[in-house]
Amino acid sequence: MTANFSTHVFSPQHCGCDRLTSIDDVRQCLTEYIYWSSYAYRNRQCAGQLYSTLLSFRDDAELVFIDIRELVKNMPWDDVKDCAEIIRCYIPDEQKTIREISAIIGLCAYAATYWGGEDHPTSNSLNALFVMLEMLNYVDYNIIFRRMN
């Protein structure tokens, strides 16, 4: 009798990339990155340079939100609007700095990893993606594009 093991590794389009070629790719890349973060480490492709840069955004999240682990554990991830409002208590929507934009991405990626599933995302980890999309706009994507490259 042989054991049946899953060998599926989630590997999004931008995971192995070193940089983005167009501002139009930022939203898609960030969406893939948060989704990728929802998988267990052994079930996702190793990060290339671009995703390594995105992983470093967790440092910005620590600077802005202080204790992101406790924040992630205690936020109501089943309610996207409430999570966005909590983040807005730290970071108002008007004219976010590059560190604040990075911190939002880092916080949501941390939440996706914390609440993620073994071989697929959970509803809470997907909501971390929706929170990020709720918080960022086209101006933010333009700003973060420069940091990602």
From Swiss-Prot:
Pfam families the UniProt entry points to: Poxv_Bcl-2-like
The entry's keywords: Early protein, Host-virus interaction, Inhibition of host NF-kappa-B by virus
Statement: the UniProt record of this protein carries the keyword RNA-binding: no
Impact reported for residue 130 to K: Disrupts self-association and NF-kappa-B inhibition by B14
InterPro entries: Poxvirus_B14/B22/C16 (IPR011212), Poxvirus_Bcl-2-like (IPR022819), Poxvirus_sf (IPR043018)
One GO CC term, this protein: cytoplasm
GO molecular function: molecular sequestering activity
Keyword Metal-binding: no
GO annotation, biological process: symbiont-mediated suppression of host NF-kappaB cascade
Family per record: Belongs to the orthopoxvirus OPG200 family.
Subunit and partners: Homodimers. Interacts with host IKBKB; this interaction inhibits host NF-kappa-B activation.
Function: Contributes to virulence by binding to the host IKBKB subunit of the IKK complex and preventing host NF-kappa-B activation in response to pro-inflammatory stimuli such as TNF-alpha or IL1B. Mechanistically, sterically hinders the direct contact between the kinase domains of IKBKB in the IKK complex containing IKBKB, CHUK/IKKA and NEMO.
Protein name (Swiss-Prot/TrEMBL): Protein OPG200
Species in which this protein is naturally found: Vaccinia virus (strain Western Reserve) (VACV)
Gene: OPG200
